[in-house]
Amino acid sequence: MVDVNRFKSMQITLASPNKVRSWSYGEVKKPETINYRTLKPEREGLFDEVIFGPTKDWECACGKYKRIRYKGIVCDRCGVEVTRAKVRRERMGHIELKAPVSHIWYFKGIPSRMGLTLDMSPRALEEVIYFAAYVVIDPKETPLEAKSLLTEREYREKLQEYGSGSFIAKMGAEAIQDLLKRVDLDAEIAELKEELKTASGQKRVKAIRRLDVLDAFQKSGNKPEWMVLNILPVIPPDLRPMLQLDGGRFATSDLNDLYRRVINRNNRLARLLELNAPGIIVQNEKRMLQEAVDALIDNGRRGRPITGPGSRPLKSLSQMLKGKQGRFRQNLLGKRVDFSGRSVIAVGPTLKMYQCGVPREMAIELFKPFVMREIVDRDIVQNVKAAKRLIERGDDRIWDILEEVIKEHPVLLNRAPTLHRLGIQAFEPVLIDGKALRLHPLACEAYNADFDGDQMAIHVPLSEEAQAEARLLMLAAEHILNPKDGKPVVTPSQDMVLGNYYLTMEGADREGEGMVFKDRDEAVMAYRNGYVHLHSRVGIAVDSMPNKPWTDEQRHKIMITTVGKILFNDIMPADLPYLQEPNNANLTDKTPDKYFLAPGSNIQEAIKNLDLNIPFKKKNLGNIIAEIFKRFRTTETSAFLDRLKDLGYYHSTLAGLTVGIADIPVIDNKQEIIDAAHHRVEEISKAFRRGLMTDDDRYEAVTATWRDAKEQLEARLVETQDAKNPIVMMMDSGARGNISNFSQLAGMRGLMAAPNGRIMELPILSNFREGLSVLEMFFSTHGARKGMTDTALKTADSGYLTRRLVDVAQDVIIREDDCGTDRGLTITAITDGKEVTETLEERLVGRYTKKSVRHPETGEIIASPDTLITEDMAHYIAEAGVSEVTIRSVFTCNTRHGVCRHCYGINLATGDAVEVGEAVGTIAAQSIGEPGTQLTMRTFHTGGVASNADITQGLPRIQEIFEARNPKGEAVITEVKGQVTDIEEDAATRTKKVYVKGATGEGEYTVPFTARMKVQVGDEVHRGAPLTEGSIQPKHLLEVRDTLSVETYLLAEVQKVYRSQGVEIGDKHVEVMVRQMLRKVRVMDPGDTGLLPGILMDIADFTDANRDIVIAGGIPATSRPVLMGITKASLETNSFLSAASFQETTRVLTDAAIRGKKDHLLGLKENVIIGKIIPAGTGMARYRNLEPLAVNEIEVIEDSEEQEDTVEE
């Protein structure tokens, strides 16, 4: 067997007739499948054992030779070789076609490869192949033209005119085959190259396309006549099986039907030829044979598809590969696996961060082989069969063994949809009763799971390596940070937040205020016995907490705090300052001095002078986690998270916060606000009736009035709310709900959207406490339904976007330490108008500098070149007032097929420098695709009629950017650097003209009358600067400026969309994607390189070709960069396996076969498809041959080998 992991590359070419014969084990001559009485395959039929091998292992057809000892013998009676039945999956047969047949992929594909080779139109080809016209093959002495078409009648007339044999004309695929044999590739290519020197327009395009195909034939060694089949391969029978159903009927693969049609027609044709039948009958039979082969290869591509029972189109060879159910996506890229299960999930609040609860019944089934081996090893039973019976009976002894087996054996939990890599994590199983999997509450956010009936799948990693990977790389406790932005993904939520919020509240004049305690135990005891409240401010001796980082003057004093805060600080790591206030100064620096008193001072007085602190909210807890992670890394953080969770749950239970209808406050002046709004609306209507405003203006004013009324109510709510109100506490802490939920309960529901998306002028004045009228209720339903449908559509759209992103970037892997590039990317803060969408500080963290960074005032060097910028350095640089920094960037990286460590920076998921072998492309795609569901679907109206187009936002805008489409509401950009000299308004054509004059020339730009201008007369503009508001068309920008400015523009645009929706994504992820869109160049002038003009090439390949020519002293080629959308970029990848498994499978494979393409297996997808270890992480070549060293463990290793032998028996 071929060892897949030794593969260097994989090539696909056209098969020559001899090649097909060499694959074949015999000719299939009869359309029969199996004999329905004996159920044995028929001789010379589609399932023949002589051709394809025995149906039973080590047994010939007639039963003369049975058992493995006759291995390799061919039976003298039935002619079947004694071997494994598995060969029926690999042995092929063939059918000798009695007439040549054209291959539909090459004749019908777009562009038609046959047509380009012969320089004939696909229509002409169709007429010839399907016997509607003759084609002149060799005119000899006659004035006919070669390749011209003749109808039946013209053909007869010409024969009479010139005499028979004076010229050769044929019809059908054999005519095409003759023409293809006559193509002289070298001469045609030379001729086309000459033509290209002068041709232009449509002619040039056609010449380039022909040249491309002919060149492909010449370079690959494929012969054009192989596009016509003389011999048809028959795929192995086990890949097109026949199964007996229980009713004695048979279910069979459609391919057998299609093959039977071909064989029947072929045999009939053979008989007709033997009988010397009339030409027209033979012709008709040949046409039917052609159609049968077409249907077998690609049913439905031409004409109506051949249908089976129930008029269902039969599934041909092409359909077996295509689409989600095809071979690529169904069986090669994703397989169902053994040792897996699924169940509903329930919450496991008592679990540790690295644990999950697995029901006993499930665990015994999943770990069955391990338990069986252990049972045999302990001599409870003698053999594996008995052990299996023991388990199936449910013997009591198996449970103790199961407990031992699962110890230290991690399992993987996965929740669909797996939008990013945190959708599969490893846990240590803990056996539980019941039938639901138990999930740690903090792991929910990464999975986006809740406990309303979600299900999860569980998988068992079997090999030692898989277990090690699960334990070291995938354990849930390691996944503290989100790969998309480097922020903690395991922030506490709901009850955990509420409990800690309640715990850290402070109250004035609660029982026990002003008491002083000698240490924490005394304080807690007083609280437990009811002498002091959690929220009372009390004193405690600082000396009783010697481990905390106090300053020298704080040490021997008394600190004012609350019992709740003492408990809250108990769970913090010792090196963290004592937390009194929810702010960063207290967290990173020290506890503020105002809380400390000299012993003997009046503590009551001091408490009166201190303001009450606000409690710790969800956001503050997130900051604490981030700080702890920064200082102590994963192990300590995950332990801390468990303590935080337990504390939160405990105290939210004790607090007993409940919600009743009386907790919803009543706003005293609601009626006044609403009356005022009604009055204002009445005035607007009057103004409209008098013709003082347009209908659009009236609509805007009315909706604005009601919005304003709602905001006033909201503001009043916030003013009057009571901090101890449970609903307010939930909202304020970030546990659940926000101000808009609150204002719908207590204020008014406000304006609603109509089914068409337009906002209705009639607001809902009631709130949920008062209750809605029937009409109001009816209005609300529109919005609710729209919300549901939007979500459903958005999920599908977002999933498809992720799929395209993954496909285009899957081969981007960290391949080396440093690429040694001499370019860098100069970055500034990203702004949108006046607003800053992403600060320079955020963009700098975790990147390497390219040039040194100097302090703008003192000139000191803050960071020298090639330094990794930490959070503190980035903060310092921003504080110093540096406005731009040149950094190493993915855009400027020179590594082939990937990125180097220095250009990428830190791995956001770990906070450390990225490792060689990290699959950063896939992570980037997931980071951009996963938040896609949070983006909005709609295109916003920019208030009123001021703009000429609606600005696209949200998901549609992201798709527009990544697919490099022409944006809606396109901005006009200048192609000249210089000054705006004049802006003229032309009322007749309703346009404005903008004049720009510069040193190199001047430009005149026409913009629509309604467009908002971005420039005024006298402004200095650079090339590619927008003159009007709107989105720039990136392809246009690429023509005017360079690649880097397009990349920078696309990066900024993507960030604007995500940041406006409050989603943070690291720049580097967007950089990886954008770089993939610009990795190709189009060759303009080939120079001496021998490249073809007009073809697309990878930048790296183009540079290589040029380098070789320059060394040899020739003229290098010139090219221009090309911006491709992600779908196009995926299909243009160098790997045909990856492209074929993405979309347009047949087109990709047709093209690859003609070119004789080699797939060098550089990406992840191609390797998954052929079952090779992926070239990321430890699968990279540089790590491939590492041998584990045994250190004083020789005995153990020998021991384990013996144990393995017992399992195999």
Swiss-Prot record:
Catalytic activity of the protein: RNA(n) + a ribonucleoside 5'-triphosphate = RNA(n+1) + diphosphate
Molecular function (GO) terms for this protein are: DNA binding; DNA-directed RNA polymerase activity; magnesium ion binding; zinc ion binding
The cofactor(s) it depends on are:
Mg(2+); Zn(2+)
List keywords of the entry alphabetically: DNA-directed RNA polymerase, Magnesium, Metal-binding, Nucleotidyltransferase, Transcription, Transferase, Zinc
List of residues binding Mg(2+)? D450, D452, D454
Return the broad EC class.
transferase
Task: Give its E.C. classification number.
Answer: 2.7.7.6
Gene3D superfamilies according to UniProt: 1.10.132.30, 1.10.150.390, 1.10.1790.20, 1.10.40.90, 2.40.40.20, 2.40.50.100, RNA polymerase II, clamp domain, RNA polymerase Rpb1, domain 3
One GO cellular component assignment for this chain's record is:
DNA-directed RNA polymerase complex
- Pfam families in the record, alphabetically? RNA_pol_Rpb1_1 (PF04997), RNA_pol_Rpb1_2 (PF00623), RNA_pol_Rpb1_3 (PF04983), RNA_pol_Rpb1_4 (PF05000), RNA_pol_Rpb1_5 (PF04998)
Does the record's keyword annotation contain Kinase?
Answer: no
Per UniProt, Zn(2+) 1 binds at C60, C62, C75, C78
The record's section on InterPro entries has: DNA-dir_RpoC_beta_prime, DNA-dir_RpoC_beta_prime_bact, RNA_pol_asu, RNA_pol_N, RNA_pol_Rpb1_1, RNA_pol_Rpb1_3, RNA_pol_Rpb1_3_sf, RNA_pol_Rpb1_4
Q: Which residues bind Zn(2+) 2?
A: C819, C893, C900, C903
The cofactor note from the UniProt entry for this protein is: Binds 1 Mg(2+) ion per subunit. Binds 2 Zn(2+) ions per subunit.
Q: Which GO terms describe its biological process?
A: DNA-templated transcription
Which family does the UniProt entry place this protein in? Belongs to the RNA polymerase beta' chain family.
Reported function: DNA-dependent RNA polymerase catalyzes the transcription of DNA into RNA using the four ribonucleoside triphosphates as substrates.
Q: How does it assemble?
A: The RNAP catalytic core consists of 2 alpha, 1 beta, 1 beta' and 1 omega subunit. When a sigma factor is associated with the core the holoenzyme is formed, which can initiate transcription.
Q: What is this protein called?
A: DNA-directed RNA polymerase subunit beta'
Q: What is the lineage of its organism?
A: Bacteria, Bacillati, Bacillota, Bacilli, Lactobacillales
